[in-house]
Amino acid sequence: MGTLILVAGENGSGKSRCAENIVAQTTGRRYYIATMQPCSEENLRRVEKHRRQRRDLRFTTLELPHRVGAAAVENGSVVLLEDVSNLLANVMFECGGNEESVYGDIEALLSRCRILVAVTITGLREDGYDGETAAYIRALNGLNQRLLARAAAALTMKDRQPFAEKGELNEII
């Protein structure tokens, strides 16, 4: 069973760069699981920015909008999962899945990794939303809490600075 490191923060907080920096300190085979399905110009720009950022990090990139538990990763590898919020949205809105199915998928992936660095969005509130959007926000907040409880280490990004919420990275990587 692998070690989970959770990197959380609001949009634009620097969480992706932080996660990439963590993975850059590791040895062995590295995978980048991209879950975003770019459907707007802004999303396409974000995907391109992330590709440029990780160009020199020797990742094997896997584009998987869902079913990350079945990802073709080498046992004992290091995996960056970018990101949990997109994965959950894809599973809920395209596949009829839920928080539980995503958590199980992440656990299945984690069982084959040495280290899994999972990126997620925090700070979303249900206020002003109803229906599917409110259900998604509740599910994401619940999933984030479960991942935080499961993680050996967790960082929260604020003003592009990482703050340790749990564990010691130096003991893991």
Briefly describe each language-model feature range.
Residues M1-G2, E74, E107-L110:
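Catalytic phosphate/metal-binding cores of nucleic-acid and nucleotide-processing enzymes, i.e., regions
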Residues G2-V73:
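Conserved P-loop
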Residues T3-V7, R30, S77-N86, I115-A118:
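Generic beta-sheet signal
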Residues N11-G12, Q37, S85, G123-L124, ...:
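Short, glycine/serine-rich, charged loops/turns that create anion-binding
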Residues A19, H50, L80, I121, ...:
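Residue-level signal for inorganic ion chemistry
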Residues T27, R58, G76-S77, C113, ...:
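Short, well-ordered alpha-helix to beta-strand connector turns
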Residues R52, L57-E100:
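Helix-adjacent hinge/juxtasegments
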